[in-house]
Protein backbone atom coordinates (compact mmCIF):
# COMPACT_ATOMS: atom_id res chain seq x y z
CA UNK A 1 0.00 0.00 0.00
CA UNK A 2 1.39 3.42 -0.93
CA UNK A 3 1.81 5.60 2.16
CA UNK A 4 1.27 9.20 1.06
CA UNK A 5 2.56 10.60 4.37
CA UNK A 6 5.85 8.69 4.43
CA UNK A 7 6.22 8.58 0.64
CA UNK A 8 6.94 4.84 0.51
CA UNK A 9 5.36 1.41 -0.01
CA UNK A 10 4.23 -0.42 3.14
CA UNK A 11 2.94 -3.94 3.72
CA UNK A 12 -0.80 -4.13 3.13
CA UNK A 13 -2.83 -4.80 6.28
CA UNK A 14 -6.57 -4.64 6.86
CA UNK A 15 -6.37 -1.23 8.58
CA UNK A 16 -4.39 0.24 5.66
CA UNK A 17 -6.85 -0.80 2.95
CA UNK A 18 -8.90 2.38 2.81
CA UNK A 19 -10.84 4.10 0.00
CA UNK A 20 -8.51 6.06 -2.25
CA UNK A 21 -5.38 4.09 -1.35
CA UNK A 22 -3.05 2.78 -4.06
CA UNK A 23 -2.43 -0.96 -3.66
CA UNK A 24 0.29 -2.92 -5.46
CA UNK A 25 -0.68 -6.56 -6.13
CA UNK A 26 1.39 -9.29 -7.82
CA UNK A 27 0.16 -9.76 -11.39
CA UNK A 28 0.14 -13.55 -10.90
CA UNK A 29 -2.73 -13.22 -8.40
CA UNK A 30 -5.23 -12.42 -11.14
CA UNK A 31 -8.46 -10.76 -10.05
CA UNK A 32 -8.67 -8.36 -12.99
CA UNK A 33 -10.02 -8.80 -16.48
CA UNK A 34 -9.12 -6.15 -19.10
CA UNK A 35 -12.65 -6.30 -20.52
CA UNK A 36 -14.71 -6.50 -17.31
CA UNK A 37 -12.43 -4.76 -14.82
CA UNK A 38 -12.00 -6.14 -11.30
CA UNK A 39 -13.14 -9.76 -11.19
CA UNK A 40 -12.44 -11.89 -8.11
CA UNK A 41 -13.20 -15.03 -10.12
CA UNK A 42 -10.48 -14.38 -12.70
CA UNK A 43 -7.34 -16.46 -12.12
CA UNK A 44 -5.48 -15.32 -15.23
CA UNK A 45 -2.29 -13.31 -14.58
CA UNK A 46 -2.82 -9.61 -15.15
CA UNK A 47 -0.86 -7.91 -17.92
CA UNK A 48 1.90 -5.79 -16.45
CA UNK A 49 1.52 -2.04 -16.42
CA UNK A 50 4.41 -0.31 -18.18
CA UNK A 51 7.14 0.33 -15.64
CA UNK A 52 7.30 4.11 -15.29
CA UNK A 53 10.76 4.14 -13.75
CA UNK A 54 12.27 2.01 -16.53
CA UNK A 55 10.74 4.29 -19.17
CA UNK A 56 11.53 7.60 -17.50
CA UNK A 57 13.44 8.84 -20.54
CA UNK A 58 10.37 8.50 -22.74
CA UNK A 59 8.10 10.34 -20.33
CA UNK A 60 7.86 14.16 -20.24
CA UNK A 61 9.76 15.40 -17.18
CA UNK A 62 6.95 17.78 -16.19
CA UNK A 63 4.45 14.92 -16.12
CA UNK A 64 6.84 12.83 -14.05
CA UNK A 65 7.40 15.70 -11.62
CA UNK A 66 3.66 16.25 -11.27
CA UNK A 67 3.15 12.56 -10.49
CA UNK A 68 5.88 12.62 -7.86
CA UNK A 69 4.37 15.76 -6.34
CA UNK A 70 0.98 14.04 -6.06
CA UNK A 71 2.50 10.89 -4.54
CA UNK A 72 3.74 12.45 -1.29
CA UNK A 73 2.52 15.14 1.05
CA UNK A 74 5.72 17.15 1.50
CA UNK A 75 7.68 16.80 -1.74
CA UNK A 76 8.67 19.73 -3.98
CA UNK A 77 9.66 18.07 -7.30
CA UNK A 78 8.10 20.87 -9.36
CA UNK A 79 10.48 23.36 -7.74
CA UNK A 80 13.45 21.50 -9.26
CA UNK A 81 11.86 20.94 -12.66
CA UNK A 82 13.40 23.84 -14.59
CA UNK A 83 16.98 23.19 -13.38
CA UNK A 84 17.41 26.96 -13.04
CA UNK A 85 17.73 29.35 -10.11
CA UNK A 86 14.67 31.55 -9.82
CA UNK A 87 13.34 33.97 -7.25
CA UNK A 88 9.78 33.95 -5.98
CA UNK A 89 9.10 37.18 -7.89
CA UNK A 90 10.31 35.77 -11.21
CA UNK A 91 8.38 32.53 -10.87
CA UNK A 92 5.24 34.37 -9.73
CA UNK A 93 5.41 36.62 -12.78
CA UNK A 94 5.66 33.58 -15.06
CA UNK A 95 2.73 31.86 -13.33
CA UNK A 96 0.63 35.04 -13.55
CA UNK A 97 1.36 35.20 -17.30
CA UNK A 98 0.33 31.56 -17.78
CA UNK A 99 -2.82 32.14 -15.72
CA UNK A 100 -3.73 35.13 -17.89
CA UNK A 101 -3.28 33.03 -21.03
CA UNK A 102 -5.38 30.15 -19.71
CA UNK A 103 -8.10 32.40 -18.32
CA UNK A 104 -8.47 34.21 -21.65
CA UNK A 105 -8.52 30.95 -23.60
CA UNK A 106 -11.21 29.43 -21.38
CA UNK A 107 -13.38 32.55 -21.40
CA UNK A 108 -13.51 33.09 -17.66
CA UNK A 109 -15.54 36.08 -16.45
CA UNK A 110 -13.27 39.14 -15.91
CA UNK A 111 -13.68 39.13 -12.12
CA UNK A 112 -12.68 35.45 -11.95
CA UNK A 113 -9.67 36.17 -14.14
CA UNK A 114 -8.62 38.97 -11.80
CA UNK A 115 -8.88 36.78 -8.70
CA UNK A 116 -7.05 33.91 -10.34
CA UNK A 117 -4.23 36.22 -11.41
CA UNK A 118 -4.05 37.77 -7.94
CA UNK A 119 -3.73 34.29 -6.43
CA UNK A 120 -0.90 33.55 -8.88
CA UNK A 121 1.10 36.50 -7.57
CA UNK A 122 0.67 35.39 -3.94
CA UNK A 123 0.79 31.60 -4.29
CA UNK A 124 4.48 31.02 -3.49
CA UNK A 125 5.10 33.72 -0.88
CA UNK A 126 5.37 30.92 1.71
CA UNK A 127 8.57 29.74 0.04
CA UNK A 128 10.29 32.61 1.83
CA UNK A 129 9.70 30.67 5.09
CA UNK A 130 13.03 29.51 6.57
CA UNK A 131 11.92 25.85 6.39
CA UNK A 132 11.58 26.00 2.61
CA UNK A 133 14.72 28.07 2.15
CA UNK A 134 16.57 25.50 4.25
CA UNK A 135 15.62 22.77 1.79
CA UNK A 136 17.82 24.46 -0.84
CA UNK A 137 21.43 23.71 0.12
CA UNK A 138 23.56 23.81 -3.00
CA UNK A 139 26.61 21.68 -3.68
CA UNK A 140 30.35 22.20 -3.96
CA UNK A 141 30.00 22.45 -7.72
CA UNK A 142 26.79 24.51 -7.62
CA UNK A 143 26.85 26.65 -4.45
CA UNK A 144 23.65 28.05 -2.99
CA UNK A 145 22.80 31.66 -3.82
CA UNK A 146 22.90 33.90 -0.75
CA UNK A 147 19.23 34.90 -0.80
CA UNK A 148 16.07 34.14 1.19
CA UNK A 149 13.62 34.48 -1.71
CA UNK A 150 14.51 31.46 -3.86
CA UNK A 151 11.62 29.57 -5.43
CA UNK A 152 13.45 27.28 -7.87
CA UNK A 153 16.84 25.58 -7.88
CA UNK A 154 18.64 22.83 -9.83
CA UNK A 155 17.73 19.32 -8.73
CA UNK A 156 21.14 18.57 -7.20
CA UNK A 157 20.85 21.59 -4.90
CA UNK A 158 17.86 20.26 -2.95
CA UNK A 159 18.50 18.58 0.38
CA UNK A 160 17.77 14.86 0.20
CA UNK A 161 17.89 14.40 3.99
CA UNK A 162 16.66 16.70 6.77
CA UNK A 163 14.68 18.34 3.99
CA UNK A 164 13.26 21.31 5.90
CA UNK A 165 16.04 22.18 8.33
CA UNK A 166 16.60 25.90 8.87
CA UNK A 167 19.77 27.38 7.39
CA UNK A 168 20.52 29.49 10.46
CA UNK A 169 19.45 26.95 13.10
CA UNK A 170 20.49 23.31 12.58
CA UNK A 171 18.31 22.27 15.52
CA UNK A 172 15.10 23.56 13.91
CA UNK A 173 13.48 21.30 11.33
CA UNK A 174 9.93 21.13 9.98
CA UNK A 175 9.19 17.74 8.35
CA UNK A 176 5.98 17.82 6.34
CA UNK A 177 6.25 21.57 5.67
CA UNK A 178 3.83 22.97 3.08
CA UNK A 179 4.77 26.35 1.68
CA UNK A 180 1.23 27.03 0.41
CA UNK A 181 -0.09 26.99 3.99
CA UNK A 182 2.52 29.61 4.90
CA UNK A 183 1.37 31.66 1.89
CA UNK A 184 -2.25 31.41 3.04
CA UNK A 185 -1.48 32.41 6.63
CA UNK A 186 0.62 35.29 5.31
CA UNK A 187 -2.49 36.77 3.66
CA UNK A 188 -4.34 36.72 6.98
CA UNK A 189 -1.32 38.25 8.72
CA UNK A 190 -1.23 41.12 6.22
CA UNK A 191 -4.90 41.96 6.76
CA UNK A 192 -4.45 41.69 10.51
CA UNK A 193 -1.50 44.07 10.44
CA UNK A 194 -2.77 46.58 7.88
CA UNK A 195 -6.57 46.50 8.16
CA UNK A 196 -7.89 44.46 11.13
CA UNK A 197 -11.45 45.71 10.47
CA UNK A 198 -11.35 44.52 6.86
CA UNK A 199 -14.66 42.86 5.85
CA UNK A 200 -12.75 39.62 5.25
CA UNK A 201 -11.29 39.68 8.77
CA UNK A 202 -12.91 41.25 11.85
CA UNK A 203 -15.12 43.86 10.17
CA UNK A 204 -18.43 41.96 10.39
CA UNK A 205 -18.01 41.56 14.16
CA UNK A 206 -16.60 44.97 15.03
CA UNK A 207 -19.52 46.04 17.22
CA UNK A 208 -19.56 42.68 18.97
CA UNK A 209 -15.85 42.81 19.75
CA UNK A 210 -15.99 46.41 20.91
CA UNK A 211 -18.94 45.60 23.17
CA UNK A 212 -16.98 42.70 24.62
CA UNK A 213 -14.03 45.00 25.25
CA UNK A 214 -11.62 42.85 23.30
CA UNK A 215 -8.30 44.69 22.85
CA UNK A 216 -7.34 44.79 19.18
CA UNK A 217 -4.19 46.16 17.66
CA UNK A 218 -4.80 49.50 15.94
CA UNK A 219 -2.73 50.91 13.12
CA UNK A 220 -0.06 53.40 14.04
CA UNK A 221 -0.15 56.83 12.38
CA UNK A 222 2.78 55.79 10.21
CA UNK A 223 1.09 52.58 9.03
CA UNK A 224 -2.21 54.37 8.41
CA UNK A 225 -0.69 56.84 5.95
CA UNK A 226 1.94 54.54 4.46
CA UNK A 227 1.12 53.65 0.87
CA UNK A 228 1.06 49.86 0.44
CA UNK A 229 2.79 48.20 -2.53
CA UNK A 230 0.40 47.83 -5.50
CA UNK A 231 0.05 44.06 -5.01
CA UNK A 232 -0.86 44.53 -1.34
CA UNK A 233 -3.34 47.27 -2.26
CA UNK A 234 -5.08 44.86 -4.65
CA UNK A 235 -5.46 42.42 -1.78
CA UNK A 236 -6.75 45.08 0.60
CA UNK A 237 -9.26 46.21 -2.04
CA UNK A 238 -10.88 42.74 -2.16
CA UNK A 239 -14.26 42.26 -0.56
CA UNK A 240 -14.74 39.33 1.82
CA UNK A 241 -15.79 36.80 -0.82
CA UNK A 242 -13.01 37.80 -3.22
CA UNK A 243 -10.39 37.54 -0.46
CA UNK A 244 -11.61 34.08 0.55
CA UNK A 245 -11.45 32.87 -3.07
CA UNK A 246 -7.92 34.21 -3.57
CA UNK A 247 -6.86 32.65 -0.26
CA UNK A 248 -8.42 29.30 -1.19
CA UNK A 249 -6.66 29.20 -4.56
CA UNK A 250 -3.34 30.07 -2.90
CA UNK A 251 -3.80 27.28 -0.37
CA UNK A 252 -4.99 24.61 -2.80
CA UNK A 253 -2.63 25.07 -5.73
CA UNK A 254 -0.80 21.80 -4.97
CA UNK A 255 -3.85 19.86 -3.82
CA UNK A 256 -2.29 19.26 -0.38
CA UNK A 257 -4.07 21.99 1.60
CA UNK A 258 -7.76 22.68 1.13
CA UNK A 259 -10.59 22.80 3.67
CA UNK A 260 -9.02 21.05 6.66
CA UNK A 261 -6.07 22.67 8.42
CA UNK A 262 -4.82 20.03 10.82
CA UNK A 263 -1.54 18.56 12.02
CA UNK A 264 -0.04 15.53 10.31
CA UNK A 265 1.91 12.67 11.90
CA UNK A 266 5.22 14.47 11.43
CA UNK A 267 3.83 17.54 13.18
CA UNK A 268 2.88 15.36 16.15
CA UNK A 269 6.52 14.27 16.49
CA UNK A 270 7.82 17.84 16.60
CA UNK A 271 10.14 18.36 19.62
CA UNK A 272 8.80 21.69 20.92
CA UNK A 273 11.43 23.86 22.61
CA UNK A 274 9.09 26.68 23.63
CA UNK A 275 5.43 27.42 24.33
CA UNK A 276 4.29 28.03 20.73
CA UNK A 277 2.68 24.62 20.36
CA UNK A 278 2.89 22.02 17.63
CA UNK A 279 3.08 22.90 13.93
CA UNK A 280 0.36 22.41 11.35
CA UNK A 281 1.92 21.13 8.12
CA UNK A 282 5.26 22.43 9.34
CA UNK A 283 4.08 25.97 10.22
CA UNK A 284 4.02 27.17 13.84
CA UNK A 285 2.38 30.05 15.64
CA UNK A 286 4.56 33.18 15.51
CA UNK A 287 6.66 31.96 12.59
CA UNK A 288 7.78 34.87 10.44
CA UNK A 289 7.68 35.37 6.70
CA UNK A 290 10.47 37.81 5.80
CA UNK A 291 9.99 40.85 3.63
CA UNK A 292 10.39 39.78 0.00
CA UNK A 293 9.59 41.11 -3.43
CA UNK A 294 6.69 39.29 -5.10
CA UNK A 295 6.26 41.49 -8.18
CA UNK A 296 9.36 42.53 -10.16
CA UNK A 297 9.78 46.29 -9.98
CA UNK A 298 7.46 46.75 -7.00
CA UNK A 299 8.49 47.38 -3.38
CA UNK A 300 8.78 44.25 -1.24
CA UNK A 301 5.89 42.91 0.81
CA UNK A 302 6.50 43.69 4.51
CA UNK A 303 7.52 41.03 7.01
CA UNK A 304 4.62 39.37 8.85
CA UNK A 305 4.14 37.11 11.87
CA UNK A 306 1.93 34.10 11.20
CA UNK A 307 -0.89 32.80 13.37
CA UNK A 308 -2.65 29.43 13.21
CA UNK A 309 -5.91 31.02 14.36
CA UNK A 310 -7.73 30.27 11.04
CA UNK A 311 -7.33 26.54 11.79
CA UNK A 312 -9.50 26.75 14.90
CA UNK A 313 -13.25 26.23 14.75
CA UNK A 314 -15.60 29.07 15.53
CA UNK A 315 -14.94 32.80 15.60
CA UNK A 316 -11.37 33.96 16.20
CA UNK A 317 -10.51 37.28 17.82
CA UNK A 318 -7.44 37.37 15.54
CA UNK A 319 -8.74 36.42 12.10
CA UNK A 320 -12.53 36.25 12.32
CA UNK A 321 -14.34 33.33 10.68
CA UNK A 322 -12.56 29.99 10.69
CA UNK A 323 -10.93 28.64 7.55
CA UNK A 324 -13.42 25.76 7.39
CA UNK A 325 -16.36 28.18 7.56
CA UNK A 326 -14.85 30.28 4.78
CA UNK A 327 -14.40 27.22 2.55
CA UNK A 328 -17.96 26.08 3.16
CA UNK A 329 -19.11 29.58 2.19
CA UNK A 330 -17.09 29.39 -1.05
CA UNK A 331 -18.58 26.01 -1.91
CA UNK A 332 -22.07 27.37 -1.31
CA UNK A 333 -21.37 30.48 -3.42
CA UNK A 334 -19.38 29.05 -6.35
CA UNK A 335 -20.11 25.33 -6.13
CA UNK A 336 -17.47 22.58 -5.82
CA UNK A 337 -17.04 22.18 -9.59
CA UNK A 338 -16.20 25.86 -10.18
CA UNK A 339 -13.72 25.83 -7.29
CA UNK A 340 -12.07 22.69 -8.64
CA UNK A 341 -11.91 24.25 -12.12
CA UNK A 342 -10.21 27.42 -10.87
CA UNK A 343 -7.85 25.36 -8.74
CA UNK A 344 -6.95 23.24 -11.78
CA UNK A 345 -6.22 26.33 -13.89
CA UNK A 346 -3.81 27.71 -11.29
CA UNK A 347 -2.11 24.34 -10.91
CA UNK A 348 -1.77 23.97 -14.68
CA UNK A 349 -0.27 27.46 -14.92
CA UNK A 350 2.17 26.64 -12.11
CA UNK A 351 3.32 23.46 -13.87
CA UNK A 352 3.71 25.29 -17.20
CA UNK A 353 5.75 28.04 -15.57
CA UNK A 354 7.87 25.49 -13.70
CA UNK A 355 8.98 24.00 -17.03
CA UNK A 356 10.52 27.28 -18.17
CA UNK A 357 14.30 27.56 -18.20
CA UNK A 358 14.29 31.29 -18.89
CA UNK A 359 16.87 33.17 -16.81
CA UNK A 360 15.73 35.25 -13.85
CA UNK A 361 16.52 38.88 -14.78
CA UNK A 362 17.22 39.85 -11.17
CA UNK A 363 19.79 37.07 -10.78
CA UNK A 364 21.34 37.85 -14.17
CA UNK A 365 21.70 41.51 -13.16
CA UNK A 366 23.13 40.48 -9.80
CA UNK A 367 25.67 38.17 -11.42
CA UNK A 368 26.69 40.85 -13.92
CA UNK A 369 27.14 43.42 -11.16
Question: Which residues does each PLM region occupy?
Answer:
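Divalent metal-dependent catalytic cores for phosphoryl transfer on phosphate-bearing substrates
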Residues: 85, 109-365
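Acidic/His-rich, divalent-metal-binding segments that scaffold phosphate/diphosphate chemistry
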Residues: 3, 8-166, 188-202, 208-209
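Long, highly charged alpha-helical interaction/scaffolding segments
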Residues: 36, 42-53, 337, 341-346, ...
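N-terminal cationic amphipathic segment used for targeting or macromolecule association
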Residues: 63-64, 365-367
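Short linear motifs at secondary-structure transitions and domain/linker junctions
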Residues: 1, 94, 319-322
Amino acid sequence: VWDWIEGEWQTATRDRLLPGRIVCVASSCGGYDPNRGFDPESKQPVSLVQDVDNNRAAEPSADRAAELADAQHDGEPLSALSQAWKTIACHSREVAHEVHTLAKATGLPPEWQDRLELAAWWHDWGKAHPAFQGSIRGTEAVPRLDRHDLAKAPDQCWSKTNRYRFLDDPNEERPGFRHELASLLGLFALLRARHPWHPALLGPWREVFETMGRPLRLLSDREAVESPPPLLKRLLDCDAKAFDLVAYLVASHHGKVRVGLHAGPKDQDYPARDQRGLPIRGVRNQDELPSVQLVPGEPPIPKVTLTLAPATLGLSFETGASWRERCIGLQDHYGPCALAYLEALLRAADIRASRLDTPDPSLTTEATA
